Amino acid sequence: MLKSTPMKPNFTLSLSFDGIRLLHRTSGGWQLVGEVALDSADLAAELAVLRKTATALEPGGLRSLLLIPDAQIKYLAIDTAGMDPAARHAAAAEALEGATPYPVADLVFDVHADGAQSHVAAVARETLEEAEAFAVEHRFHPVSFAAAPAAEAFVGVPHFGMTQAASALLDPGETVTPEAEPIVISGVMSAPAGPIVDTDETTPVADTPVANTPVADTPVADTPVAEPDLV
C-alpha cells in the first residue's frame, strides 16, 4: 500500500470580486507576492508576471491553495449539542436545504464543531469548478480549496477538498492537509533578485513540508478539522 504523505501548498491564490492576490507561505506567515485588478487592461499578462515571480521564489515548483470569496459561500451556525460527526453532517445538510439557490447535492460543505454549535460553510460545486478552471488556465497549479472568512462567520478554516487537477500535480501518495489557522497576510514579499525567467512550470515537484510550515500568527480555537462533505 502506498504511504500517504501530507503536504501543504506553498502558495495561495486568493480570488475576489476586487481582484486576485498571490500569497507565499514563509516561516513568518503568508506574504503577499502581488495582486492584479480584475479590470486590468491585460489580465493574462499581469497574472503571468505573478506566476513567474512565484516560480522564481520556489524554483522547484508552484502549487496553490485556492481561496474562494466569501460572497460565494453560505455560512450557517446550527445547534448540534450531543451529536456525533455523522449526526452533525446530517443536521448541516438539512439546514442547507433551501438556504442557497442550489440543491444540497450540488454543494460542497465543511462542518466544524464549536461546543454546542457547529459552523457550516457551503459552496456550489460549479463555483469550485470555475475557480479551478481559471487557476489552471493561468498555470497556478491549484491542488485544493479553502476560504478565509471573518472570525464571527466560522471557527477555523473551511476546507472544500482537493481539485480535479491535484492528481496530476501531487506526487504519488501525497494528500493536502487542511489549514489549521486562518490565512491572513503577515507582510509583503520582496521581489526576487535578478531577472524573472519563465521556467518550466508544467511539472511542479516541490512543496512546503507540513513539519516546517508555520502559518499566520492568528490563533484559532482548538476545533477538529473535518473533511468536507462531498454530497
Model-found features: residue ranges?
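Hydrophobic/aromatic-enriched cytosolic interaction surfaces used to assemble or bind macromolecules
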Residues: 1-231
